[in-house]
Amino acid sequence: MLKKSCRLCNQKLFEKPLLTLHGMPKAAQHFLNKDELFNDESIDLDIFQCMSCGLVQLNIEPVSYFKEVITAASISGDAKKSRLNQMLEFSTKYNLKNKKIIEIGCAKGNMLDIIEEAQMNAYGLEYSSDSVSIAKKEGRRVIKGFIGDIEEIKYGPYHGFVCFNYLEHVPDPKSVINKIYNNLYSNGIGLITVPNLEYLLNTKCFYEFVADHLSYFTIETLKNAFSSNKFDVLECNLINNENDILIIVKKNPQKKI
């Protein structure tokens, strides 16, 4: 069923799409087998904007595997160094050394090793049974589940959370943000990254509009996603040559919405 209201604030979408992309793949993950390839058809992606909060989004149903984080490779080389520096700064600046941090959508848990190296106690939440099994064999503390389905995350509450390019995949980002909020201590800190919509538009990277990505954030709409759900925004910057947005937020139980 096509959505007519915003995924974030539940207000109306503009009636006409901002953009329609023709001949797009039904999904961005999983290779098709021979039979599936024969029967596969492209789709049109209609990209809408909320009349109220401005969030740009698809109005389609999520792909079947949206609860899972699918990554092709481990983190190594320059990427690992960059992530470690990021986590060291996060740990030091926000007094998170030896505190419990959970990664929402952690795949096989490779990032958890880096969080541990930054002297935080790393936990992960992942829906894929295969990924959880691999993570546990590596000695990582990974919990099986999807944040949108869980009221209380095992071993919680947590002092902080991280979420790397996952929020754009979920069909109900408001619910996910609220579930995270409810599993943090009163002053819990979060670090989140998402793709930068303005970069996609400025560089005409229309192939980055995929059925897997349901929400397309700008700095302002990402700030609003958290500030409208009882978080204070502490930082918000462009990273990775402006490909992504990084936001740091703090739970504020006193905040009135």
Pin down the residues of each PLM region.
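Conserved SAM-binding strand-loop segment of SAM-dependent methyltransferases
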Residues: 139-150
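N-terminal juxtadomain amphipathic helix
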Residues: 1-79, 237, 248
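A short glycine-rich, Lys/Arg-flanked "PGG" loop and its adjoining helix->strand segment in the class I
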Residues: 174-189
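Extended interfacial segments that mediate partner engagement and assembly in macromolecular machines
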Residues: 40-134, 145
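A conserved beta-strand element that flanks and buttresses the S-adenosyl-L-methionine
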Residues: 162
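Flexible, glycine-/basic-rich loop-and-beta segments that form/coincide
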Residues: 234, 242-257
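Short, glycine-/aromatic-enriched active-site segment of Class I SAM-dependent methyltransferases
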Residues: 23-29, 192-215, 219-221
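A SAM-dependent methyltransferase catalytic signature shared across enzymes that methylate proteins
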Residues: 8-15, 219-236
